[in-house]
Amino acid sequence: MLARELQIFLLNKPGEMRMKTLSIIIPTYNTLKIYFQKCLLSLLCEQQNEIEIIIVDDGSQEQYSGEIKREIENSLLDIKYYKKKNGGQNSAREYGLAHATGKYVFFMDADDYVDSNALDRIISLLKKHKPIILAFNYDVRTPDGNIIEEHNRWKGEYKKVNVTRGLLYSDSLWLQIYDRDVFCKSGIHLVQGVRIGEDMATATAFLATIGTEYSTDECLYHYIKHPGSALSNPPEESALDMLQAFEAMLKQLDISVQTKYYAEFEWLAILHILYYNTMRVLTNYRGNVEYIKAIEVWMNENFPNWRENSYLKTESIAKKWMFVLIKNGHTKLLFDLEEAKKKIKIILGIVSRKTIK
Protein backbone atom coordinates (compact mmCIF):
# COMPACT_ATOMS: atom_id res chain seq x y z
CA MET A 1 0.00 0.00 0.00
CA LEU A 2 2.98 2.30 0.56
CA ALA A 3 3.88 1.85 -3.12
CA ARG A 4 0.37 3.03 -4.02
CA GLU A 5 0.86 6.14 -1.84
CA LEU A 6 4.21 6.87 -3.48
CA GLN A 7 2.76 6.49 -6.97
CA ILE A 8 0.00 9.01 -6.26
CA PHE A 9 2.42 11.39 -4.52
CA LEU A 10 4.66 11.44 -7.61
CA LEU A 11 1.66 12.06 -9.86
CA ASN A 12 0.69 15.04 -7.73
CA LYS A 13 3.95 16.71 -6.75
CA PRO A 14 3.32 20.09 -5.10
CA GLY A 15 3.33 23.08 -7.44
CA GLU A 16 2.29 26.64 -6.82
CA MET A 17 0.02 27.33 -3.84
CA ARG A 18 -3.68 27.54 -4.70
CA MET A 19 -7.04 26.75 -3.18
CA LYS A 20 -7.72 23.02 -3.14
CA THR A 21 -11.06 21.71 -4.29
CA LEU A 22 -11.96 19.70 -1.21
CA SER A 23 -11.30 19.87 2.53
CA ILE A 24 -12.13 16.58 4.25
CA ILE A 25 -12.79 17.08 7.98
CA ILE A 26 -12.52 13.96 10.14
CA PRO A 27 -13.21 14.17 13.90
CA THR A 28 -11.68 11.36 15.92
CA TYR A 29 -12.30 10.28 19.50
CA ASN A 30 -10.67 7.09 20.80
CA THR A 31 -10.89 5.69 17.28
CA LEU A 32 -9.40 2.24 16.81
CA LYS A 33 -6.27 2.15 14.63
CA ILE A 34 -7.71 -0.46 12.27
CA TYR A 35 -10.65 1.81 11.34
CA PHE A 36 -8.55 4.95 11.03
CA GLN A 37 -6.03 3.21 8.76
CA LYS A 38 -8.77 2.10 6.40
CA CYS A 39 -10.32 5.57 6.43
CA LEU A 40 -7.05 7.26 5.44
CA LEU A 41 -6.09 4.71 2.80
CA SER A 42 -9.46 5.13 1.10
CA LEU A 43 -8.68 8.81 0.52
CA LEU A 44 -5.82 8.03 -1.86
CA CYS A 45 -6.95 9.09 -5.32
CA GLU A 46 -5.54 10.32 -8.62
CA GLN A 47 -6.54 13.92 -7.86
CA GLN A 48 -4.76 13.94 -4.50
CA ASN A 49 -3.46 17.46 -5.10
CA GLU A 50 -7.09 18.66 -4.94
CA ILE A 51 -7.59 17.43 -1.36
CA GLU A 52 -6.60 18.53 2.13
CA ILE A 53 -7.43 16.33 5.11
CA ILE A 54 -8.10 17.84 8.53
CA ILE A 55 -8.01 15.49 11.51
CA VAL A 56 -9.51 16.91 14.71
CA ASP A 57 -8.74 14.81 17.79
CA ASP A 58 -11.61 15.58 20.15
CA GLY A 59 -9.78 14.86 23.41
CA SER A 60 -8.89 11.19 22.86
CA GLN A 61 -6.95 9.23 25.47
CA GLU A 62 -3.21 9.42 24.85
CA GLN A 63 -2.88 5.83 23.61
CA TYR A 64 -5.39 6.53 20.82
CA SER A 65 -3.94 9.97 20.03
CA GLY A 66 -0.48 8.41 19.74
CA GLU A 67 -1.68 5.80 17.25
CA ILE A 68 -3.47 8.43 15.17
CA LYS A 69 -0.39 10.66 15.03
CA ARG A 70 1.85 7.75 14.01
CA GLU A 71 -0.53 6.88 11.16
CA ILE A 72 -0.46 10.51 10.00
CA GLU A 73 3.34 10.67 10.17
CA ASN A 74 3.62 7.54 8.02
CA SER A 75 1.22 8.85 5.38
CA LEU A 76 2.05 10.87 2.27
CA LEU A 77 -1.40 12.47 2.31
CA ASP A 78 -1.78 16.22 2.90
CA ILE A 79 -2.99 16.05 6.52
CA LYS A 80 -3.39 18.70 9.20
CA TYR A 81 -3.74 17.39 12.75
CA TYR A 82 -5.31 19.27 15.66
CA LYS A 83 -6.12 18.16 19.17
CA LYS A 84 -8.70 19.92 21.32
CA LYS A 85 -10.64 19.46 24.53
CA ASN A 86 -13.54 17.05 24.19
CA GLY A 87 -16.69 18.82 23.07
CA GLY A 88 -18.56 16.39 20.85
CA GLN A 89 -18.51 15.55 17.16
CA ASN A 90 -19.96 18.82 15.85
CA SER A 91 -17.63 20.80 18.09
CA ALA A 92 -14.72 18.99 16.41
CA ARG A 93 -16.23 19.58 12.96
CA GLU A 94 -16.60 23.29 13.70
CA TYR A 95 -12.95 23.41 14.78
CA GLY A 96 -11.91 21.71 11.56
CA LEU A 97 -14.09 24.01 9.49
CA ALA A 98 -12.28 27.02 10.97
CA HIS A 99 -8.98 25.60 9.67
CA ALA A 100 -10.25 24.43 6.26
CA THR A 101 -9.09 26.19 3.08
CA GLY A 102 -10.74 24.15 0.31
CA LYS A 103 -13.51 25.34 -1.98
CA TYR A 104 -15.71 22.50 -0.70
CA VAL A 105 -15.99 20.72 2.64
CA PHE A 106 -16.79 17.06 3.29
CA PHE A 107 -17.46 15.79 6.82
CA MET A 108 -16.38 12.16 7.36
CA ASP A 109 -16.49 9.87 10.38
CA ALA A 110 -13.13 8.35 11.35
CA ASP A 111 -14.39 4.75 11.33
CA ASP A 112 -15.97 4.95 7.87
CA TYR A 113 -14.29 5.00 4.46
CA VAL A 114 -14.92 6.05 0.87
CA ASP A 115 -14.56 4.63 -2.64
CA SER A 116 -11.41 6.29 -3.99
CA ASN A 117 -12.51 5.99 -7.64
CA ALA A 118 -15.85 7.60 -6.84
CA LEU A 119 -13.99 10.35 -4.96
CA ASP A 120 -11.97 11.11 -8.10
CA ARG A 121 -15.10 11.38 -10.21
CA ILE A 122 -16.89 13.53 -7.64
CA ILE A 123 -13.97 15.97 -7.48
CA SER A 124 -14.27 16.31 -11.26
CA LEU A 125 -18.00 17.02 -10.91
CA LEU A 126 -17.34 19.69 -8.28
CA LYS A 127 -14.79 21.44 -10.50
CA LYS A 128 -16.99 21.24 -13.59
CA HIS A 129 -20.44 22.15 -12.21
CA LYS A 130 -19.67 24.08 -8.99
CA PRO A 131 -22.82 23.07 -7.02
CA ILE A 132 -23.51 24.49 -3.55
CA ILE A 133 -24.54 21.05 -2.27
CA LEU A 134 -23.75 17.70 -3.91
CA ALA A 135 -25.49 14.58 -2.60
CA PHE A 136 -24.34 11.02 -3.37
CA ASN A 137 -25.23 7.40 -2.66
CA TYR A 138 -23.88 5.22 0.14
CA ASP A 139 -24.00 1.76 1.64
CA VAL A 140 -23.87 0.30 5.15
CA ARG A 141 -21.24 -2.35 5.89
CA THR A 142 -19.96 -4.56 8.67
CA PRO A 143 -16.45 -3.86 10.02
CA ASP A 144 -15.30 -6.72 7.74
CA GLY A 145 -16.63 -4.92 4.68
CA ASN A 146 -19.73 -7.01 4.01
CA ILE A 147 -22.63 -4.95 2.63
CA ILE A 148 -25.71 -4.82 4.89
CA GLU A 149 -27.73 -2.16 3.06
CA GLU A 150 -27.41 -0.26 -0.22
CA HIS A 151 -28.92 3.22 -0.49
CA ASN A 152 -29.05 4.20 -4.16
CA ARG A 153 -31.31 7.21 -3.75
CA TRP A 154 -29.91 9.29 -6.59
CA LYS A 155 -29.92 8.46 -10.32
CA GLY A 156 -27.82 9.96 -13.09
CA GLU A 157 -24.29 11.33 -13.20
CA TYR A 158 -25.37 14.86 -12.23
CA LYS A 159 -28.95 16.06 -11.66
CA LYS A 160 -30.81 18.85 -9.90
CA VAL A 161 -32.63 17.66 -6.78
CA ASN A 162 -36.17 18.57 -5.79
CA VAL A 163 -35.50 20.20 -2.41
CA THR A 164 -38.60 18.69 -0.79
CA ARG A 165 -37.21 15.24 -1.63
CA GLY A 166 -33.69 16.25 -0.62
CA LEU A 167 -34.91 17.22 2.86
CA LEU A 168 -36.16 13.69 3.43
CA TYR A 169 -32.66 12.31 2.83
CA SER A 170 -30.41 14.89 4.53
CA ASP A 171 -30.24 13.27 7.95
CA SER A 172 -26.42 12.96 8.00
CA LEU A 173 -23.77 15.57 7.22
CA TRP A 174 -21.58 12.96 5.50
CA LEU A 175 -24.27 12.38 2.85
CA GLN A 176 -23.44 15.64 1.08
CA ILE A 177 -20.46 17.81 0.10
CA TYR A 178 -20.89 21.53 0.76
CA ASP A 179 -19.55 24.78 -0.67
CA ARG A 180 -17.45 25.91 2.30
CA ASP A 181 -17.93 29.66 1.87
CA VAL A 182 -21.71 29.38 1.48
CA PHE A 183 -21.91 26.99 4.43
CA CYS A 184 -19.97 29.35 6.71
CA LYS A 185 -21.95 32.44 5.68
CA SER A 186 -25.41 30.84 5.72
CA GLY A 187 -26.14 31.61 9.36
CA ILE A 188 -26.69 27.89 10.01
CA HIS A 189 -24.54 26.57 12.83
CA LEU A 190 -23.38 23.03 13.55
CA VAL A 191 -25.84 21.93 16.25
CA GLN A 192 -24.04 20.93 19.45
CA GLY A 193 -24.84 19.65 22.93
CA VAL A 194 -26.67 16.48 21.85
CA ARG A 195 -25.39 12.99 21.06
CA ILE A 196 -28.17 12.01 18.67
CA GLY A 197 -29.70 14.18 15.97
CA GLU A 198 -26.99 16.82 15.49
CA ASP A 199 -26.36 15.74 11.89
CA MET A 200 -30.00 15.83 10.85
CA ALA A 201 -30.58 19.18 12.56
CA THR A 202 -27.64 20.84 10.79
CA ALA A 203 -27.85 19.28 7.32
CA THR A 204 -31.61 19.75 7.01
CA ALA A 205 -31.50 23.37 8.20
CA PHE A 206 -28.75 24.22 5.70
CA LEU A 207 -30.52 22.65 2.72
CA ALA A 208 -33.84 24.31 3.60
CA THR A 209 -32.12 27.69 3.92
CA ILE A 210 -30.08 27.44 0.71
CA GLY A 211 -32.89 25.84 -1.29
CA THR A 212 -30.75 24.22 -3.99
CA GLU A 213 -29.04 20.83 -4.31
CA TYR A 214 -27.61 18.53 -6.97
CA SER A 215 -26.95 14.80 -6.83
CA THR A 216 -24.82 12.10 -8.41
CA ASP A 217 -25.35 8.35 -8.60
CA GLU A 218 -21.78 7.71 -7.41
CA CYS A 219 -21.70 5.45 -4.33
CA LEU A 220 -19.01 7.35 -2.44
CA TYR A 221 -19.51 6.53 1.21
CA HIS A 222 -19.21 3.26 3.14
CA TYR A 223 -20.81 3.63 6.56
CA ILE A 224 -19.58 1.09 9.11
CA LYS A 225 -22.15 -0.33 11.51
CA HIS A 226 -20.52 -1.71 14.62
CA PRO A 227 -21.43 -2.35 18.29
CA GLY A 228 -19.46 0.63 19.60
CA SER A 229 -21.48 3.35 17.86
CA ALA A 230 -23.57 5.92 19.75
CA LEU A 231 -26.73 4.76 17.98
CA SER A 232 -26.10 1.11 18.91
CA ASN A 233 -25.52 1.83 22.60
CA PRO A 234 -26.97 5.26 23.40
CA PRO A 235 -26.45 6.42 27.01
CA GLU A 236 -29.71 7.04 28.86
CA GLU A 237 -29.05 10.76 29.19
CA SER A 238 -29.40 10.96 25.40
CA ALA A 239 -32.87 9.36 25.40
CA LEU A 240 -34.60 12.59 24.35
CA ASP A 241 -31.70 14.25 22.52
CA MET A 242 -33.54 14.09 19.20
CA LEU A 243 -36.24 16.40 20.57
CA GLN A 244 -33.60 18.97 21.52
CA ALA A 245 -31.86 18.59 18.16
CA PHE A 246 -35.12 19.18 16.31
CA GLU A 247 -35.85 22.29 18.36
CA ALA A 248 -32.33 23.59 17.66
CA MET A 249 -32.92 23.04 13.94
CA LEU A 250 -36.22 24.94 13.91
CA LYS A 251 -34.72 27.85 15.86
CA GLN A 252 -32.17 28.38 13.08
CA LEU A 253 -34.83 28.67 10.38
CA ASP A 254 -36.83 31.69 9.28
CA ILE A 255 -40.58 31.35 9.69
CA SER A 256 -40.96 31.57 5.91
CA VAL A 257 -38.69 28.53 5.47
CA GLN A 258 -40.54 26.57 8.17
CA THR A 259 -43.83 27.36 6.45
CA LYS A 260 -42.57 26.49 2.96
CA TYR A 261 -41.35 23.04 4.04
CA TYR A 262 -43.80 22.41 6.89
CA ALA A 263 -44.94 19.01 5.57
CA GLU A 264 -41.32 17.84 5.25
CA PHE A 265 -40.33 18.99 8.74
CA GLU A 266 -43.45 17.40 10.17
CA TRP A 267 -42.62 14.11 8.43
CA LEU A 268 -39.04 14.23 9.71
CA ALA A 269 -40.42 14.68 13.24
CA ILE A 270 -42.74 11.71 12.74
CA LEU A 271 -39.88 9.58 11.44
CA HIS A 272 -37.02 10.58 13.74
CA ILE A 273 -38.86 11.44 16.95
CA LEU A 274 -42.12 9.49 17.01
CA TYR A 275 -40.76 6.35 15.33
CA TYR A 276 -36.96 6.04 15.66
CA ASN A 277 -36.78 7.71 19.09
CA THR A 278 -39.62 5.57 20.41
CA MET A 279 -37.91 2.44 19.10
CA ARG A 280 -34.69 3.43 20.90
CA VAL A 281 -36.65 3.85 24.14
CA LEU A 282 -38.29 0.45 23.70
CA THR A 283 -35.01 -1.26 22.83
CA ASN A 284 -32.58 0.41 25.23
CA TYR A 285 -34.64 1.78 28.13
CA ARG A 286 -37.25 -0.96 28.61
CA GLY A 287 -40.07 1.15 27.24
CA ASN A 288 -39.67 3.89 29.87
CA VAL A 289 -43.19 5.33 30.18
CA GLU A 290 -41.98 8.86 30.98
CA TYR A 291 -39.85 9.01 27.83
CA ILE A 292 -42.70 7.68 25.68
CA LYS A 293 -45.07 10.25 27.17
CA ALA A 294 -42.56 13.07 26.59
CA ILE A 295 -42.30 12.08 22.92
CA GLU A 296 -46.08 12.00 22.48
CA VAL A 297 -46.53 15.38 24.21
CA TRP A 298 -43.77 16.96 22.11
CA MET A 299 -45.30 15.73 18.86
CA ASN A 300 -48.80 16.93 19.75
CA GLU A 301 -47.55 20.35 20.88
CA ASN A 302 -45.27 21.02 17.92
CA PHE A 303 -47.16 19.24 15.13
CA PRO A 304 -50.76 18.85 16.38
CA ASN A 305 -52.08 17.59 13.02
CA TRP A 306 -49.24 15.17 12.29
CA ARG A 307 -51.64 12.26 11.68
CA GLU A 308 -52.79 14.02 8.50
CA ASN A 309 -49.26 14.35 7.05
CA SER A 310 -49.24 13.36 3.37
CA TYR A 311 -45.99 11.36 3.68
CA LEU A 312 -47.75 8.86 5.93
CA LYS A 313 -49.54 7.69 2.78
CA THR A 314 -46.57 7.65 0.41
CA GLU A 315 -43.47 6.57 2.37
CA SER A 316 -42.95 2.79 2.53
CA ILE A 317 -41.65 2.83 6.11
CA ALA A 318 -45.05 4.10 7.27
CA LYS A 319 -46.55 0.76 6.17
CA LYS A 320 -44.38 -1.33 8.51
CA TRP A 321 -46.31 -2.95 11.33
CA MET A 322 -44.03 -1.53 14.05
CA PHE A 323 -44.51 1.97 12.64
CA VAL A 324 -48.30 1.47 12.55
CA LEU A 325 -48.37 0.31 16.19
CA ILE A 326 -46.38 3.35 17.34
CA LYS A 327 -48.46 5.74 15.22
CA ASN A 328 -51.63 4.40 16.83
CA GLY A 329 -50.24 4.61 20.37
CA HIS A 330 -49.73 0.87 20.95
CA THR A 331 -46.19 1.18 22.34
CA LYS A 332 -46.92 -1.12 25.31
CA LEU A 333 -48.02 -3.88 22.94
CA LEU A 334 -44.92 -3.39 20.81
CA PHE A 335 -42.69 -3.52 23.89
CA ASP A 336 -44.33 -6.76 25.05
CA LEU A 337 -43.85 -8.28 21.58
CA GLU A 338 -40.17 -7.26 21.51
CA GLU A 339 -39.60 -8.73 24.99
CA ALA A 340 -41.32 -11.96 23.96
CA LYS A 341 -39.09 -12.13 20.89
CA LYS A 342 -35.97 -11.81 23.09
CA LYS A 343 -37.17 -14.62 25.39
CA ILE A 344 -37.89 -16.89 22.42
CA LYS A 345 -34.35 -16.29 21.11
CA ILE A 346 -32.91 -17.22 24.52
CA ILE A 347 -35.01 -20.40 24.68
CA LEU A 348 -34.05 -21.39 21.14
CA GLY A 349 -30.39 -20.80 22.01
CA ILE A 350 -30.63 -23.08 25.06
CA VAL A 351 -32.41 -25.79 23.05
CA SER A 352 -29.80 -25.51 20.30
CA ARG A 353 -26.90 -25.92 22.75
CA LYS A 354 -28.55 -28.95 24.37
CA THR A 355 -29.12 -30.51 20.94
CA ILE A 356 -25.44 -30.06 20.03
CA LYS A 357 -24.36 -31.74 23.29
Label every model-predicted segment.
Residues 105:
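Short aromatic/hydrophobic "clamp" motif used to bind/position activated sugar donors
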Residues 220-226, 232-260, 271-306:
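Catalytic core of nucleotide-sugar-dependent glycosyltransferases
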Residues 21-23, 42, 52, 201:
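Cell-envelope/extracellular polymer assembly enzymes that use nucleotide-activated donors
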Residues 84-100:
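Glycine-rich, basic loop-to-helix element that forms the pyrophosphate-binding segment
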Residues 110-216, 221-238, 249:
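Donor-binding/catalytic cores of nucleotide-activated saccharide
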Residues 57-68:
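A conserved acidic beta->alpha catalytic loop
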Residues 31-45:
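Short, well-formed alpha-helical segments that are part of the catalytic scaffolds
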Residues 5, 11-13, 283-357:
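Membrane-interface aromatic/basic loop that binds lipid-linked glycans or pyrophosphate carriers
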